[in-house]
Protein backbone atom coordinates (compact mmCIF):
# COMPACT_ATOMS: atom_id res chain seq x y z
CA UNK A 1 0.00 0.00 0.00
CA UNK A 2 1.10 3.55 -0.69
CA UNK A 3 0.86 6.69 1.40
CA UNK A 4 -1.63 8.95 -0.39
CA UNK A 5 0.16 11.98 1.11
CA UNK A 6 3.10 11.27 -1.20
CA UNK A 7 0.83 11.90 -4.20
CA UNK A 8 0.13 15.18 -5.96
CA UNK A 9 -3.42 15.93 -7.04
CA UNK A 10 -2.53 15.22 -10.67
CA UNK A 11 -0.94 11.89 -9.76
CA UNK A 12 -4.05 10.84 -7.85
CA UNK A 13 -6.27 11.91 -10.75
CA UNK A 14 -4.23 9.78 -13.15
CA UNK A 15 -4.41 6.83 -10.78
CA UNK A 16 -8.21 7.12 -10.45
CA UNK A 17 -8.64 7.37 -14.22
CA UNK A 18 -6.52 4.23 -14.63
CA UNK A 19 -9.02 2.48 -12.34
CA UNK A 20 -11.98 3.82 -14.38
CA UNK A 21 -12.95 6.26 -11.64
CA UNK A 22 -13.87 9.93 -12.08
CA UNK A 23 -10.88 12.30 -11.94
CA UNK A 24 -12.79 14.89 -9.88
CA UNK A 25 -12.87 12.45 -6.95
CA UNK A 26 -9.19 13.28 -6.37
CA UNK A 27 -10.05 16.88 -5.53
CA UNK A 28 -12.79 15.73 -3.16
CA UNK A 29 -10.38 13.37 -1.39
CA UNK A 30 -7.75 16.11 -1.09
CA UNK A 31 -10.37 18.46 0.36
CA UNK A 32 -11.22 15.93 3.07
CA UNK A 33 -7.58 15.29 3.91
CA UNK A 34 -6.03 18.76 3.71
CA UNK A 35 -8.90 21.12 4.51
CA UNK A 36 -11.11 19.05 6.81
CA UNK A 37 -8.23 17.00 8.28
CA UNK A 38 -10.15 13.73 7.91
CA UNK A 39 -7.71 10.85 7.86
CA UNK A 40 -10.08 7.91 7.23
CA UNK A 41 -11.51 7.23 3.76
CA UNK A 42 -14.68 5.80 5.35
CA UNK A 43 -15.49 9.21 6.86
CA UNK A 44 -15.43 11.03 3.51
CA UNK A 45 -19.17 11.49 3.08
CA UNK A 46 -19.39 12.52 -0.58
CA UNK A 47 -17.17 9.69 -1.83
CA UNK A 48 -19.07 6.62 -3.16
CA UNK A 49 -18.76 3.38 -1.21
CA UNK A 50 -17.06 1.63 -4.15
CA UNK A 51 -14.44 4.40 -4.45
CA UNK A 52 -13.80 4.38 -0.70
CA UNK A 53 -13.12 0.65 -0.85
CA UNK A 54 -10.80 1.09 -3.83
CA UNK A 55 -8.85 3.81 -2.00
CA UNK A 56 -8.71 1.81 1.24
CA UNK A 57 -7.40 -1.25 -0.61
CA UNK A 58 -4.56 0.69 -2.24
CA UNK A 59 -3.70 3.63 0.02
CA UNK A 60 -3.31 4.65 3.61
CA UNK A 61 -3.39 8.22 4.92
CA UNK A 62 0.01 8.32 6.58
CA UNK A 63 -0.56 10.77 9.41
CA UNK A 64 1.50 9.74 12.45
CA UNK A 65 -0.02 9.12 15.84
CA UNK A 66 0.87 11.30 18.82
CA UNK A 67 2.78 9.25 21.40
CA UNK A 68 3.75 12.21 23.56
CA UNK A 69 2.75 15.87 23.72
CA UNK A 70 4.32 18.52 25.93
CA UNK A 71 3.07 22.07 26.34
CA UNK A 72 5.04 24.98 27.80
CA UNK A 73 3.66 26.80 30.81
CA UNK A 74 2.86 29.87 28.71
CA UNK A 75 1.02 27.60 26.23
CA UNK A 76 2.95 29.07 23.30
CA UNK A 77 5.08 26.00 22.53
CA UNK A 78 4.09 22.39 21.92
CA UNK A 79 6.51 19.52 21.49
CA UNK A 80 5.23 16.35 19.83
CA UNK A 81 6.60 12.85 19.51
CA UNK A 82 5.02 11.33 16.40
CA UNK A 83 5.06 7.63 15.53
CA UNK A 84 4.80 6.40 11.94
CA UNK A 85 3.28 3.12 10.74
CA UNK A 86 6.64 1.32 10.88
CA UNK A 87 7.17 2.27 14.54
CA UNK A 88 9.77 4.96 13.89
CA UNK A 89 9.47 8.07 16.03
CA UNK A 90 10.32 11.69 15.26
CA UNK A 91 9.87 15.08 16.93
CA UNK A 92 8.06 18.22 15.82
CA UNK A 93 7.69 21.51 17.66
CA UNK A 94 4.91 24.08 17.25
CA UNK A 95 5.55 27.69 18.29
CA UNK A 96 2.73 30.21 18.55
CA UNK A 97 3.51 33.79 17.55
CA UNK A 98 1.36 36.88 17.04
CA UNK A 99 1.95 36.62 13.28
CA UNK A 100 0.85 32.96 13.16
CA UNK A 101 1.82 29.44 14.15
CA UNK A 102 5.16 27.93 13.12
CA UNK A 103 6.21 24.30 13.09
CA UNK A 104 9.69 22.82 13.17
CA UNK A 105 9.58 19.52 11.27
CA UNK A 106 11.95 16.58 11.00
CA UNK A 107 13.17 15.32 7.62
CA UNK A 108 14.87 12.08 8.71
CA UNK A 109 14.58 9.58 11.54
CA UNK A 110 17.82 10.49 13.29
CA UNK A 111 20.74 12.11 11.46
CA UNK A 112 24.18 11.08 10.19
CA UNK A 113 25.86 14.50 10.19
CA UNK A 114 27.42 14.12 13.64
CA UNK A 115 27.23 17.76 14.82
CA UNK A 116 28.56 17.79 18.37
CA UNK A 117 25.87 20.07 19.82
CA UNK A 118 22.88 18.07 18.50
CA UNK A 119 21.20 15.11 20.20
CA UNK A 120 19.42 14.04 16.99
CA UNK A 121 22.63 12.66 15.52
CA UNK A 122 23.85 10.59 18.47
CA UNK A 123 22.37 7.31 17.20
CA UNK A 124 22.93 8.00 13.50
CA UNK A 125 20.27 8.00 10.80
CA UNK A 126 17.66 5.25 10.59
CA UNK A 127 15.89 6.32 7.40
CA UNK A 128 14.71 9.24 5.31
CA UNK A 129 11.18 10.56 5.64
CA UNK A 130 9.10 10.73 2.47
CA UNK A 131 7.59 13.99 1.25
CA UNK A 132 4.21 12.91 2.62
CA UNK A 133 5.66 11.97 6.00
CA UNK A 134 7.20 15.42 6.37
CA UNK A 135 3.91 17.00 5.30
CA UNK A 136 1.95 14.82 7.72
CA UNK A 137 3.69 16.36 10.74
CA UNK A 138 2.04 19.68 9.92
CA UNK A 139 -1.37 18.07 9.52
CA UNK A 140 -1.13 16.04 12.73
CA UNK A 141 -0.04 19.15 14.65
CA UNK A 142 -2.84 21.28 13.15
CA UNK A 143 -5.39 18.70 14.23
CA UNK A 144 -3.91 18.58 17.75
CA UNK A 145 -3.83 22.33 18.36
CA UNK A 146 -7.00 23.11 16.40
CA UNK A 147 -5.37 25.98 14.52
CA UNK A 148 -3.79 26.55 11.13
CA UNK A 149 0.00 26.44 10.84
CA UNK A 150 1.31 29.05 8.41
CA UNK A 151 5.10 28.86 8.81
CA UNK A 152 7.40 25.85 8.43
CA UNK A 153 11.00 25.41 9.54
CA UNK A 154 12.92 22.34 8.37
CA UNK A 155 15.13 22.29 11.42
CA UNK A 156 14.10 19.18 13.36
CA UNK A 157 15.85 15.81 13.28
CA UNK A 158 17.78 15.10 10.11
CA UNK A 159 19.71 17.04 7.48
CA UNK A 160 17.22 18.22 4.82
CA UNK A 161 19.79 18.31 2.01
CA UNK A 162 20.81 14.72 2.83
CA UNK A 163 17.23 13.81 1.84
CA UNK A 164 17.17 16.16 -1.14
CA UNK A 165 14.65 14.48 -3.45
CA UNK A 166 12.01 13.93 -0.76
CA UNK A 167 12.51 17.36 0.78
CA UNK A 168 12.14 19.19 -2.54
CA UNK A 169 9.05 17.11 -3.31
CA UNK A 170 7.74 18.16 0.11
CA UNK A 171 8.37 21.82 -0.76
CA UNK A 172 6.39 21.39 -3.97
CA UNK A 173 3.56 19.65 -2.10
CA UNK A 174 3.23 21.92 0.93
CA UNK A 175 3.15 25.09 -1.17
CA UNK A 176 0.52 23.77 -3.58
CA UNK A 177 -2.95 25.30 -3.35
CA UNK A 178 -4.29 21.74 -3.60
CA UNK A 179 -2.79 20.82 -0.19
CA UNK A 180 -1.80 23.17 2.66
CA UNK A 181 -1.03 26.21 0.47
CA UNK A 182 1.79 27.53 2.66
CA UNK A 183 3.70 30.32 0.93
CA UNK A 184 7.33 29.68 -0.01
CA UNK A 185 8.41 32.82 1.85
CA UNK A 186 6.99 31.24 5.01
CA UNK A 187 9.38 28.28 4.81
CA UNK A 188 12.94 28.04 6.15
CA UNK A 189 15.29 25.17 5.34
CA UNK A 190 18.27 24.70 7.65
CA UNK A 191 21.39 22.83 6.54
CA UNK A 192 24.79 22.04 8.04
CA UNK A 193 26.27 22.98 4.66
CA UNK A 194 26.32 20.28 1.98
CA UNK A 195 27.89 22.43 -0.73
CA UNK A 196 26.75 20.66 -3.95
CA UNK A 197 23.18 20.42 -2.66
CA UNK A 198 23.10 24.14 -1.76
CA UNK A 199 23.88 24.86 -5.41
CA UNK A 200 21.30 22.32 -6.57
CA UNK A 201 18.71 23.94 -4.31
CA UNK A 202 19.62 27.35 -5.74
CA UNK A 203 18.91 26.04 -9.24
CA UNK A 204 15.37 25.15 -8.12
CA UNK A 205 14.87 28.88 -7.46
CA UNK A 206 12.47 28.53 -4.52
CA UNK A 207 11.50 31.66 -2.60
CA UNK A 208 12.26 29.96 0.71
CA UNK A 209 14.77 31.12 3.33
CA UNK A 210 17.99 29.13 3.47
CA UNK A 211 19.60 28.89 6.91
CA UNK A 212 23.20 27.72 7.20
CA UNK A 213 24.49 26.21 10.46
CA UNK A 214 27.87 27.94 10.62
CA UNK A 215 28.88 28.08 14.30
CA UNK A 216 32.49 29.09 13.62
CA UNK A 217 34.32 31.33 11.14
CA UNK A 218 37.41 29.10 11.36
CA UNK A 219 37.83 25.74 9.64
CA UNK A 220 39.70 24.08 12.51
CA UNK A 221 37.04 24.80 15.14
CA UNK A 222 34.18 24.13 12.73
CA UNK A 223 35.68 20.70 11.98
CA UNK A 224 35.68 19.97 15.71
CA UNK A 225 32.03 20.97 16.07
CA UNK A 226 30.68 19.78 12.71
CA UNK A 227 32.19 16.81 10.82
CA UNK A 228 30.75 18.14 7.53
CA UNK A 229 33.50 20.79 7.71
CA UNK A 230 36.06 18.05 7.02
CA UNK A 231 34.52 17.74 3.56
CA UNK A 232 33.76 21.38 2.74
CA UNK A 233 35.86 24.34 3.87
CA UNK A 234 34.34 27.66 4.90
CA UNK A 235 35.67 29.12 1.64
CA UNK A 236 33.80 26.47 -0.37
CA UNK A 237 30.67 26.98 1.75
CA UNK A 238 30.76 30.75 1.24
CA UNK A 239 31.17 30.27 -2.52
CA UNK A 240 28.05 28.07 -2.51
CA UNK A 241 26.21 30.73 -0.48
CA UNK A 242 27.21 33.40 -3.00
CA UNK A 243 25.91 31.17 -5.79
CA UNK A 244 22.62 30.74 -3.91
CA UNK A 245 22.22 34.48 -3.28
CA UNK A 246 23.03 35.40 -6.89
CA UNK A 247 20.67 32.75 -8.25
CA UNK A 248 17.68 33.41 -5.96
CA UNK A 249 18.24 36.98 -4.78
CA UNK A 250 17.23 35.67 -1.35
CA UNK A 251 18.97 36.61 1.90
CA UNK A 252 20.67 33.74 3.74
CA UNK A 253 20.43 33.28 7.49
CA UNK A 254 23.59 32.09 9.23
CA UNK A 255 22.94 30.26 12.49
CA UNK A 256 25.59 30.57 15.14
CA UNK A 257 25.22 28.60 18.40
CA UNK A 258 27.37 30.28 21.03
CA UNK A 259 29.34 27.91 23.26
CA UNK A 260 30.96 29.33 26.37
CA UNK A 261 34.73 29.62 25.98
CA UNK A 262 34.78 28.00 22.54
CA UNK A 263 33.35 30.20 19.79
CA UNK A 264 31.98 33.24 21.63
CA UNK A 265 35.02 35.54 21.84
CA UNK A 266 35.42 39.01 20.35
CA UNK A 267 38.13 37.54 18.10
CA UNK A 268 35.61 35.08 16.63
CA UNK A 269 33.03 37.85 16.19
CA UNK A 270 35.53 39.95 14.23
CA UNK A 271 36.57 36.97 12.09
CA UNK A 272 32.91 36.16 11.38
CA UNK A 273 32.34 39.78 10.37
CA UNK A 274 35.16 39.45 7.83
CA UNK A 275 33.84 36.15 6.45
CA UNK A 276 30.31 37.52 5.97
CA UNK A 277 31.13 41.09 4.94
CA UNK A 278 29.19 42.25 1.88
CA UNK A 279 26.88 39.23 1.81
CA UNK A 280 23.09 39.49 1.62
CA UNK A 281 22.68 37.79 4.97
CA UNK A 282 21.41 37.82 8.52
CA UNK A 283 23.00 36.19 11.58
CA UNK A 284 20.89 34.40 14.17
CA UNK A 285 22.78 34.00 17.45
CA UNK A 286 21.61 31.00 19.46
CA UNK A 287 22.46 30.12 23.07
CA UNK A 288 23.63 26.51 22.56
CA UNK A 289 21.37 23.70 23.77
CA UNK A 290 23.14 21.85 26.55
CA UNK A 291 23.08 18.06 26.19
CA UNK A 292 24.61 15.57 28.61
CA UNK A 293 26.64 13.85 25.88
CA UNK A 294 28.96 16.84 25.50
CA UNK A 295 30.45 19.49 27.75
CA UNK A 296 29.14 22.50 25.83
CA UNK A 297 27.78 25.28 28.04
CA UNK A 298 25.67 28.25 27.00
CA UNK A 299 27.53 31.47 26.52
CA UNK A 300 26.59 34.25 28.94
CA UNK A 301 24.02 36.81 27.82
CA UNK A 302 26.70 39.50 28.15
CA UNK A 303 28.99 37.60 25.76
CA UNK A 304 26.16 36.96 23.32
CA UNK A 305 25.24 40.65 23.27
CA UNK A 306 28.88 41.72 22.87
CA UNK A 307 29.31 39.22 20.03
CA UNK A 308 26.18 40.55 18.32
CA UNK A 309 27.28 44.16 18.72
CA UNK A 310 30.56 43.47 16.88
CA UNK A 311 28.61 42.02 13.96
CA UNK A 312 26.20 44.97 13.91
CA UNK A 313 29.09 47.45 14.00
CA UNK A 314 30.37 45.75 10.85
CA UNK A 315 27.04 46.18 9.08
CA UNK A 316 25.76 42.62 9.54
CA UNK A 317 22.11 42.33 10.56
CA UNK A 318 22.01 40.24 13.72
CA UNK A 319 19.38 38.93 16.11
CA UNK A 320 19.48 36.78 19.24
CA UNK A 321 17.04 33.89 18.99
CA UNK A 322 14.19 34.16 21.43
CA UNK A 323 14.03 31.04 23.57
CA UNK A 324 10.52 29.61 23.64
CA UNK A 325 9.20 26.83 25.82
CA UNK A 326 12.39 26.59 27.86
CA UNK A 327 10.54 24.44 30.40
CA UNK A 328 9.95 21.69 27.80
CA UNK A 329 12.64 22.50 25.28
CA UNK A 330 15.23 19.76 25.60
CA UNK A 331 17.73 19.98 22.76
CA UNK A 332 16.51 18.75 19.39
CA UNK A 333 16.42 14.96 19.48
CA UNK A 334 16.53 14.54 23.25
CA UNK A 335 12.83 13.87 23.78
CA UNK A 336 12.82 11.15 21.12
CA UNK A 337 16.06 9.69 22.46
CA UNK A 338 14.78 9.51 26.04
CA UNK A 339 11.51 7.90 24.86
CA UNK A 340 13.13 5.33 22.53
CA UNK A 341 15.74 4.29 25.12
CA UNK A 342 13.08 3.34 27.69
From Swiss-Prot:
**Localization per record:** Cytoplasm
What keywords appear on the UniProt entry? 4Fe-4S, Cytoplasm, Disulfide bond, Iron, Iron-sulfur, Metal-binding, Methyltransferase, rRNA processing, S-adenosyl-L-methionine, Transferase, tRNA processing
Q: Tell me if Oxidoreductase is a UniProt keyword of this record.
A: no
GO MF annotation terms: 4 iron, 4 sulfur cluster binding; metal ion binding; rRNA (adenine(2503)-C2-)-methyltransferase activity; rRNA binding; tRNA (adenine(37)-C2)-methyltransferase activity; tRNA binding
Q: InterPro entries under this entry?
A: Aldolase_TIM (IPR013785), Methyltransferase_A (IPR040072), RlmN_N (IPR048641), RNA_MTrfase_RlmN (IPR027492), rRNA_lsu_MTrfase_RlmN/Cfr (IPR004383), rSAM (IPR007197)
E.C. code: 2.1.1.192
Q: Which residues bind [4Fe-4S] cluster?
A: 111, 115, 118
Q: Which reaction does it catalyse?
A: adenosine(2503) in 23S rRNA + 2 reduced [2Fe-2S]-[ferredoxin] + 2 S-adenosyl-L-methionine = 2-methyladenosine(2503) in 23S rRNA + 5'-deoxyadenosine + L-methionine + 2 oxidized [2Fe-2S]-[ferredoxin] + S-adenosyl-L-homocysteine; adenosine(37) in tRNA + 2 reduced [2Fe-2S]-[ferredoxin] + 2 S-adenosyl-L-methionine = 2-methyladenosine(37) in tRNA + 5'-deoxyadenosine + L-methionine + 2 oxidized [2Fe-2S]-[ferredoxin] + S-adenosyl-L-homocysteine
Q: What class of enzyme is it?
A: transferase
The entry's active site is 91 (proton acceptor), 332 (s-methylcysteine intermediate)
What this protein needs as a cofactor is:
[4Fe-4S] cluster
Q: Where does S-adenosyl-L-methionine bind?
A: 158-159, 190, 213-215, 289
User: Radical SAM core domain location, by residue?
Assistant: 97-327
The similarity annotation says: Belongs to the radical SAM superfamily. RlmN family.
Function in brief = Specifically methylates position 2 of adenine 2503 in 23S rRNA and position 2 of adenine 37 in tRNAs.
User: What PANTHER family is this protein classified in?
Assistant: 23S RRNA METHYLTRANSFERASE, RADICAL SAM CORE DOMAIN-CONTAINING PROTEIN
Q: What other note does the entry give for this protein?
A: Reaction proceeds by a ping-pong mechanism involving intermediate methylation of a conserved cysteine residue.
Please give the name of this protein. Answer: Probable dual-specificity RNA methyltransferase RlmN
Amino acid sequence: MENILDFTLEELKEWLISKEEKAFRAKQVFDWIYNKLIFDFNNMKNIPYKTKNLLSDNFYIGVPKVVKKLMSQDKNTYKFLFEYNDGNIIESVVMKYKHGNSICVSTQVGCRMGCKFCASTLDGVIRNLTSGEILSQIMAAQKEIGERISNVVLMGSGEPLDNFKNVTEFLDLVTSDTTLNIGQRHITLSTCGIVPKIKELADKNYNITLAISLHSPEDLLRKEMMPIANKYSIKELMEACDYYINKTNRRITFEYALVKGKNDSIKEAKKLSTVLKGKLCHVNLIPVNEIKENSYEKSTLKNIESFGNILKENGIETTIRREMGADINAACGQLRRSYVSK
